[in-house]
Design a protein with these regions (language model features):
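C-terminal functional module detector
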Residues: 1-135
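Carbohydrate-binding surfaces of carbohydrate-active enzymes
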Residues: 46-72, 81-82, 95-98, 134, ...
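Acidic, contiguous N-terminal accessory segments
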Residues: 122-124, 133-283, 500, 505-509, ...
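Structural recognition of the beta-strand scaffold that forms the well-ordered cores
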Residues: 163, 285-288, 317, 389, ...
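Flexible loop/turn segments at secondary-structure boundaries
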Residues: 177-178, 295-297, 323-329, 394-400, ...
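Feature activates predominantly on carbohydrate-active enzymes
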Residues: 218-425, 429-435, 440-453, 494, ...
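Active-site neighborhood of glycoside hydrolase catalytic domains
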Residues: 400-406, 410, 414-521, 526-539
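Flexible, acidic glycine-rich loops studded with aromatic residues
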Residues: 505-511, 516-521, 527-647
Length: 647
């Protein structure tokens, strides 16, 4: 009953994700809909055609720790080569189906899951959806409109535009010049089509792609139009970002091999005919990455940015400092990376009062040099992504305190955090010496990151030390503050003044509301939506990032199936269905909701591969939340488009 109330997000989310499935040895029992949800989340199915479209290869990956014993009954007009199949845990199995000429866009493979029993104690009957010709490269049925995020308007047309060696690029607007290389580079490297660029359509014998000024105020900075026919592609925008996003849509309409890292060979490089008009819903479409708990190479940060740009996300929130590691080089304070970037070991289990922590005994550390950061910032800028750096304060500062213990309430000694969670030791709010330190750090941050916002955290700052600290209590009396919450607000406001003085704006987590929000601050609402509602009603810019919906370090499905992760369950369907505009806001108040962001905290995410595994496809869904208005979203259609993008 309570699950029907959206306010109780965790409970409803859990109920949505097969919590009523019982597992005993290898036997699964439960209500049929929960069993099907379990299987849907466990299996990844990809198809391809071979032998002149007479044989379908079906690669099935079982991502769960549960085996599935399958009896195949039929598959439309195709003949399965196997009748009995076991999908072992965490492994891939290949099925083969034969037919005279596999032309249909979709097939249904019907099977009985022999170790999954419904409430009537009968084996579960399950239908696997297999993709046919619509998902094969170089065929007459290639014309699929698999753009994510979904465009504002897409009118399907007959025919297709085929790139060939005679195709020409017509550049009529200089705003398209920089974005254009993201198309021509892939066509040259991957498709072996080094297309010529010219300024007019004179002396053109074949088809062409023309980039022109739209002169349409409704498109804003990021909107675009694309008109595709067999003879030409017309790309219209008024700003560089608009042309860039148009090119991202064109790339998604091409065969998926266009995203290969090496030369790809297909029958043709075609794009289905259509008229597209596209404008984003929100100006802020963000993805976060915590590098404080675990560090990732520069090459992966660039890949992360590439994936964001492909999906028209435009803000990368880079969480650079934590209790467990300081990851940004500060030249005035080199000890921050000499000492603060290294922890002596790392906890490897989920500990509690009843379960002691288990540690790996291995030192861990590293940081990004300022030259590396400049390189990444420039890389993001080329892809129309602004990086928002986070230096978390006054809490989550244990790595800094281990370096400079005099900045804490007790004076130390401190050590860089080795376990996850919240530490009582934070910056001493009554110590005036913390401000020169903060300002030194921020001045170097300002020079590295040209964006208007700097994130100062403000979250999870225990007041335990402040309550017993003479300096903090003296500061409360001196400023005539009510309590330690107002003391934190004093710290945030003082930092905000320094930011504003240097031409920057402050953004922080929703705890900065406690004790009174800084006057010009923007807020990220992570503890549900209440903080965002309060801030929007007060006229503050708000980014919605509630943990129930968009924390991608949370489990994607059953905690029994997936590797150790944070939080509870945050399923793809639940994420996709989220609307960042709270119903409690008036139309005018809703204008203060500037966008949405997904967060990836990395306590249990050690490698780049794990980051991708946890972030996607849910980050893909968040991209659509941020770009596409609710009336243009459709869950089933999204799944179809997503399946194609997995290729």
């Amino acid at each position: 009953m309570f699950a029907r109330e959206r306010s109780d997000g965790y409970l409803r989310n859990a109920l949505l994700d097969h919590c009523f499935v019982e597992l005993l040895n290898d036997t699964i029992s439960g209500e049929e809909r929960w069993l099907k949800k379990l299987i849907n989340s466990s299996l990844d199915i990809r198809t391809r055609l071979i032998n002149n479209n007479t044989r379908m290869v079906v690669d099935v990956t079982n991502k769960s720790s549960i085996p599935y014993h399958i009896h195949i009954t039929q598959c439309d007009n195709l003949k399965p080569e196997q009748k009995e199949v076991t999908l072992s845990p965490m492994s891939q199995t290949t099925l083969f189906l034969n037919g005279d000429d596999i032309k249909s866009p979709q097939y249904t493979l019907r099977a009985s899951i022999k170790n999954a029993f419904n409430t009537e104690k009968k084996p579960l009957e399950y239908a696997f959806r297999l993709r046919g010709m619509d998902y094969m490269v170089g065929t007459e049925s290639q014309n699929m409109y698999n753009i994510i995020p979904a465009p504002r308007s897409l009118e399907e047309k007959q025919g297709k535009f085929i790139f060939n060696k005679e195709t020409r690029i017509i550049l009529k607007d200089k705003n398209a010049e920089a974005p254009l290389r993201f198309l021509t580079d892939r066509l040259t490297r991957i498709a072996q089509l080094p297309l010529k660029i010219q300024n007019s359509t004179k002396s053109i014998s074949g088809n062409y792609v023309v980039f022109s000024r739209a002169n349409d105020p409704t498109l804003g900075n990021e909107g675009y139009k694309i008109n595709i026919s067999p003879e030409q592609i017309q790309v219209l925008a008024d700003k560089e970002a608009g042309f860039f996003y148009a090119i991202q849509s064109l790339l998604q309409l091409l065969p998926p091999e266009i995203y290969s890292n090496t030369t790809a060979y297909t029958n043709e490089w075609s794009i289905p005919a259509a008229n597209i008009t596209d404008i984003p819903q929100f100006e802020y479409r963000g993805l976060h990455l915590d590098v404080g708990r675990h560090l990732y190479p520069v090459s992966f940060i660039k890949k992360y940015i590439d994936l964001m740009s492909m999906q028209k996300m435009n803000r990368f929130h880079w969480h650079l400092t934590e209790d467990q590691g300081w990851r940004i080089e500060i030249k005035k304070h080199p000890k921050l990376t000499e000492i603060g970037s290294m922890r002596k070991e790392t906890i490897i289990n989920r500990y509690s009062a009843a379960i002691p922590g288990i540690y790996d005994g291995t030192p861990y550390g590293g940081f990004y040099t300022q030259e590396e950061i400049k390189e990444i910032v420039a890389y993001a800028k080329e892809r129309y992504i602004t990086i928002i750096p986070e230096v978390d304060l006054p809490g989550h500062m244990l790595a800094a305190l281990a370096t400079y213990p005099e900045l804490g309430c007790t004076g130390g000694p401190y050590e860089v955090g080795t376990r996850w969670g919240i530490y009582d030791d934070v910056l001493c709010a009554g110590n005036e010496n913390i401000y020169p330190f903060i300002e030194d750090v921020l001045l170097e941050v300002f020079k590295l990151f040209p964006g208007e916002y700097v994130h100062i955290g403000g979250d999870e700052c225990p007041k335990t030390r402040w309550k017993s600290c003479p300096k903090c209590q003296s500061k409360i009396k001196e400023l005539k503050l009510k309590d330690e919450h107002e003391l934190q607000s004093y710290v945030i406001r003082r930092v905000e003044k320094f930011l504003n003085k240097n031409g920057k704006k402050l953004i922080g987590w929703d705890e900065i509301l406690e004790g009174g929000i800084a006057p010009n601050a923007a807020l990220m609402s992570w503890r549900g939506v209440a903080g965002g509602i309060t801030a929007a009603k007060s006229g503050h810019p708000v980014i919605m990032t509630p943990n129930t919906y968009v924390y991608l370090d949370h489990y994607q499905a059953s905690m029994d199936i997936y590797p150790l992760a944070n939080g509870r369950i945050c399923a793809l369907e639940w994420t996709y269905g989220y609307n960042p505009i709270p119903k409690e806001l008036t139309e005018q108040e809703a204008k203060h909701i500037k966008g949405v962001q997904a967060n990836v905290w990395t306590e249990y995410i050690k490698t780049p591969e794990q980051v991708e595994y946890m972030a996607y496809p849910r980050a893909n869904a968040v991209a659509e939340i941020g770009w596409s208005s609710p009336e243009h979203k459709n869950w089933e259609d999204y799944l179809d488009r997503l399946q194609y993008q997995f290729k």
